[in-house]
UniProtKB/Swiss-Prot annotation:
It holds the Pfam family F-box. It comes from the Eukaryota. Gene3D superfamilies: 1.20.1280.50. InterPro entries: F-box-like_dom_sf, F-box_dom, SCF_F-box_component. This is Probable F-box protein At3g25550. Residues 19-55 form the F-box domain. It comes from Arabidopsis thaliana.
Length: 179
């Protein structure tokens, strides 16, 4: 009998509880952090496919993006209270979030590289200096960019960065970078 009981408990452990509806699975996946999603890809081929598929990952990314944009807007609101000269010299700006990624850049020091960051996975990448930034290395005139556009090309799936100088732009046009 003890052997029979042991076999029975093994059977229970091996039972797979199937989630009846893929919509329910997607609703669960949407709320999970990226690290957990990575682990859950080993559960089954079906889960791996659901997590990696466009339909499975886009709601998750959309959810994370919404959450990230909200937190960034809160940071912007808090940053306005820092008005000392020291803080203005170190002013760090950031772009809107795209697929959980956003760019950090200096609004004052053009010699600092632009960084792309994914806070969920703790991934970051320093981008090569844009032409406008390289010009700032050579010129003593300070050329700043007033806007940094960050987006994703829906056809190719590549991320695009547009660096736009403020007027008067001294003949420098906007610059697009892909990565």
């Amino acid at each position: 009998m003890i052997m029979h009981h042991g076999r029975e408990s093994k059977r229970r452990r091996r039972q797979v509880i199937k989630i009846p509806n893929d919509d329910v699975l997607e609703e669960i996946i949407v709320r999970l952090p990226v690290k957990t999603l990575t682990r859950f890809q080993t559960v089954s081929k079906h889960w791996r496919h659901t997590i990696k598929s466009r339909n499975g990952s886009k709601p998750s990314i959309r959810y994370k993006t919404m959450r990230l944009e909200w937190s960034l807007s809160r940071l912007v609101g808090e940053e306005e209270y820092l008005t000392s000269k020291k803080h203005k010299e170190r002013r760090i700006l950031f772009s809107k979030s795209v697929d959980g990624l956003f760019c950090l850049y200096s609004g004052v020091d053009m010699k600092q590289p632009i960084m792309v960051i994914n806070p969920d996975t703790r991934w970051s990448k320093k981008l090569p200096l844009a032409r406008i930034q390289r010009k700032n290395y050579l010129d003593s005139n300070k050329v700043e960019f007033s806007r940094l556009g960050f987006g994703k090309d829906s056809v190719t799936g590549t991320y695009k960065l547009a660096v736009i100088p403020p007027p008067p732009n001294h003949g420098i046009k906007h610059e697009n970078m892909s990565f």
